[in-house]
Every structure is written in structure tokens, then in C-alpha cells.
Swiss-Prot record:
The system is composed of three essential subunits: KdpA, KdpB and KdpC. The complex also contains KdpF, a small non-essential subunit. The KdpFABC complex exists as a dimer above concentrations of 30-50 nM, whereas the complex exists as a functional monomer at lower concentrations. The chain crosses the membrane at residues 6-34. Keywords: ATP-binding, Cell inner membrane, Cell membrane, Ion transport, Membrane, Nucleotide-binding, Potassium, Potassium transport, Transmembrane, Transmembrane helix, Transport. Its main location: membrane. GO terms for cellular component: plasma membrane; potassium ion-transporting ATPase complex; potassium:proton antiporter complex. This is Potassium-transporting ATPase KdpC subunit. One of its GO terms (molecular function) is P-type potassium transmembrane transporter activity. Part of the high-affinity ATP-driven potassium transport (or Kdp) system, which catalyzes the hydrolysis of ATP coupled with the electrogenic transport of potassium into the cytoplasm. This subunit acts as a catalytic chaperone that increases the ATP-binding affinity of the ATP-hydrolyzing subunit KdpB by the formation of a transient KdpB/KdpC/ATP ternary complex. It is a single-pass membrane protein. It comes from the Bacteria. The gene is kdpC. One of its GO terms (biological process) is potassium ion transmembrane transport.
Amino acid sequence: MSGLRPALSTFIFLLLITGGVYPLLTTVLGQWWFPWQANGSLIREGDTVRGSALIGQNFTGNGYFHGRPSATAEMPYNPQASGGSNLAVSNPELDKLIAARVAALRAANPDASASVPVELVTASASGLDNNITPQAAAWQIPRVAKARNLSVEQLTQLIAKYSQQPLVKYIGQPVVNIVELNLALDKLDE
């Protein structure tokens, strides 16, 4: 019985620290130092939440830039179904899937001349990625320009404006947030 008291008091102490103090401290510090990120990096227009800067959305119309394929098949970009998605390179189903995606992209972008960018036919590790390279966005310019009656120059400037450089220049590559880019396209129409 004498050994039970130290074990119980240690349990209660650790329960309070790990179940109360630590979560409250990290929540308070997160809200204080990084309020936008701690609340989901939400993109707002006035009081309306239009999306998150961290999760892609399913833009399908010709007047929008399309992101990477979502791995969450039933409901695209569903964060509750996030997970690994790509088939192994040795799997013949991957070749069929990529060929079907390339054919669909070619049909939707008949004026695009270069080969289809790889990130437009392969899902990301989470299946929720909202970023593509500026080159993948530029590949879609003819379709978007035609659908929105905008010039190639306007869209090129918009892509450049919403391109984000990596924190360290030689680690990573520039990316474009598709959600922010498409919301900016909608603002051009207003």
C-alpha cells in the first residue's frame, strides 16, 4: 500500500501536466504568436470564410486553374479522408490512371503546347495539396484566358503575384496557391 501513494501522485501530476497545462500553454502561445495559422490559415472575404490556404479545393470549371488531383475520391479535398494515395511505380494501374488524367487534361486544354506537368496528374502525399508550380499554372493559361476573356499577360502577372518562393532558395521550388489564385480571378470579374 505504501508504494501505491507515490505511483498515484505521480500519475495525477503527469495527468495535470500533459492533459491540462501543456495543451493550454501550447494553445495560448499558438494563438498569441501565430493566430492566423493556429486557426487554420482561413482565407476570408469580409465575414465569409472562402477556404484555407492549406487545403486545396475542387475547381473544375474552364475559368479556373486546376490543382493536383485529390486522393479523396468520394468528396475531393476532404481533410477527414487524407492519406497516401499514389500507387506504386511498379503498379500497372498507375500507368492507366496517369494516361487517363493526361487525356482529360489534354482534352480540357487543347491550346496547351508543352507536355502536361507532372503535378497535374499525380496526387500529393496527403491528397489535399493546394500548391502547384508556376509552370503548371502557366500551362493552363490558354484555357483560363479563353474562358474568362482575359489576356495571357494578365494571367501571367497574376500567377507571378501569387507565386511564393521557398524560405531557403536552394531548398524547394516556387509554388502557387491555387485557392488564392482562383479567388483573385473571381475578384477580377467584380
